[in-house]
């Protein structure tokens, strides 16, 4: 009887080990929070360099997609350009500031300000991509895509932002989007 219990315990341990392995495979990659926190700190530094009173803004990472379609007879396809963005928002002034950057956060561009009182319209587009769309005027727009976390470090900033994204979405939908 004791021998049977020892074998059963060993079998249960092996089953748990195998199930743990499968659950990790199906769960997907785990977020490296140390790397994510370091990148969030770099985002803050770049944003504060670019934006006066940058500390007054909360931040998320976002990106834009520019898709160009081509048709060369039998060859059809598309080419997508990704633009990385540090997106800051201030609830009191109802302002969104977008600062272009690169995936490794080694540099930044100049900020663009979108004040609620000065834009033509803003809305959340659910299809074909989940994007926050802002039209500052009739001639142009920006579509900001944002997710909790994206794993491809060659294309996107590596940062986990579930809580921040929820706060930005709430601000955008309740205080910034036009009806």
Name the predicted role of every residue range.
Residues 11, 46, 56, 60-62, ...:
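Intrinsically disordered, low-complexity N-terminal regions enriched in serine/proline/glycine
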Residues 1-18:
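Short, Lys/Arg-enriched N-terminal segments with co-localized hydrophobic residues
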Residues 67-72, 95-98, 105-107, 139-151:
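Short, surface-exposed beta-strand/loop "edge" segments at domain boundaries and coil↔beta transitions
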Residues 21, 112-113, 117-179:
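Acidic, Ser/Thr- and proline-rich intrinsically disordered linker/docking segments
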Residues 2-4, 20, 84-86, 149, ...:
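Acidic/proline-rich low-complexity IDRs
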Residues 20-89:
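Anionic N-terminal interaction surfaces
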Residues 78-84, 91-131:
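Phosphoinositide-binding peripheral membrane targeting modules
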